[in-house]
């Protein structure tokens, strides 16, 4: 039986392009090690050039808009090309922080208090009286995220610029506590890792720079009961968004062991510094084995 021919989608047009290229390189090496024939393709918005390749499936190594928001998934579905990760609807919902929060609330999964900000005056609310976060509704990798001690410390010129750029922002209560991220693989939560950035915030640089000095604590330093509860909630989030394949959910765990979900990522990074491969490896699943599972899990109608 001949090995599958795989179309590896990487790069793309989003602000997370560099991360996607890094994920793509790691995935490419794993796929080649597994003996698959691999064609790398760097798509642009609306591009259907990949249809010229007669491949058995597409491995989606894209991050951010176009690759993570249901767009590329829709193109692949229309052409009946099997692909990895989540489907059209779940990708679109997970990428939209407002829609995913509403799903979490409906599923009784605790998430920080929030408000949609369309203009500066919308910030005159109860959340603004304490520490809060402003973030774009449809970006990943902490792109455009601002942490504010209170409303008076906010750079309103910067906020106006962001509103012009993104249209609207999500204002979210800042939860003090441990930063914990959990991975789900199919029908199983694999584990949870604690992140300790050298700075106050696990931003883009802390996630992807080798010089960031971010500490990874695996497994997360939590009481066993709380650790298991984080895993249970990560799996519930995966299910309530109808996700497929591998996901990573981000949490804050307070001193009182209250667990708040921040978001679920349907296209978690697979770079050398990424968390899902580290969690999987601790769980006994080497990177190559993880990639093989994702290939075997690929399908349409996701």
Predicted regions and their residues:
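Phosphate-binding site of ATP-dependent enzymes
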Residues: 149-232, 253-260
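ATP-binding N-terminal substructure of ATP-dependent carboxylate-amine bond-forming enzymes
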Residues: 1-89, 93-95, 99, 118-124, ...
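Glycine-rich phosphate/pyrophosphate-binding beta-alpha loops
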Residues: 142, 198, 265-279
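A glycine- and small-aliphatic-rich helix-loop capping segment at beta-alpha/alpha-beta transitions
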Residues: 74-83, 150-155, 282-285
């Amino acid at each position: 039986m001949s090995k599958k021919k795989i179309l590896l989608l990487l790069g793309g047009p989003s602000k997370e392009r560099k991360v996607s290229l890094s994920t793509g390189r790691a995935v490419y090496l794993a796929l080649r090690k597994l003996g698959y024939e691999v064609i790398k393709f760097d798509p642009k918005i609306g591009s259907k050039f990949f249809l010229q390749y007669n491949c058995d499936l597409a491995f989606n190594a894209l991050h951010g808009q176009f690759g993570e928001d249901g767009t590329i998934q829709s193109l692949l579905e229309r052409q009946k090309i099997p692909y990895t990760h989540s489907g059209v609807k779940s990708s679109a919902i997970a990428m939209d922080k407002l829609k995913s929060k509403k799903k979490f609330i409906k599923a009784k999964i605790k998430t920080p208090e929030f408000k949609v900000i369309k203009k500066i005056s919308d910030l005159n609310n109860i959340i603004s009286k304490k520490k809060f976060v402003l973030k774009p509704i449809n970006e990943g990798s902490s792109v455009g995220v601002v942490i504010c001690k209170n409303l008076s410390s906010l750079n309103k010129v910067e906020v106006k610029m962001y509103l012009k750029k993104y249209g609207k922002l999500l204002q979210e209560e800042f939860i003090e506590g441990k930063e914990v991220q959990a991975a789900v693989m199919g029908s199983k939560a694999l584990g949870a890792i604690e992140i300790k950035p050298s700075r106050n915030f696990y931003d883009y640089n802390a996630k992807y720079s080798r010089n960031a000095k971010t500490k990874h604590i695996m497994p997360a330093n939590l009481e066993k009961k709380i650790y298991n509860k984080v895993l249970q909630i990560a799996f519930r989030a995966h299910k309530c968004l109808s996700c497929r394949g591998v996901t990573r959910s981000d949490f804050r765990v307070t001193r009182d062991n209250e667990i708040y979900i921040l978001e679920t990522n349907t296209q978690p990074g697979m770079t050398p510094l990424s968390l899902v491969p580290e969690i999987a490896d601790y769980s006994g699943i080497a990177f190559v084995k993880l990639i093989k599972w994702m290939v075997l899990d690929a399908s349409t109608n996701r």
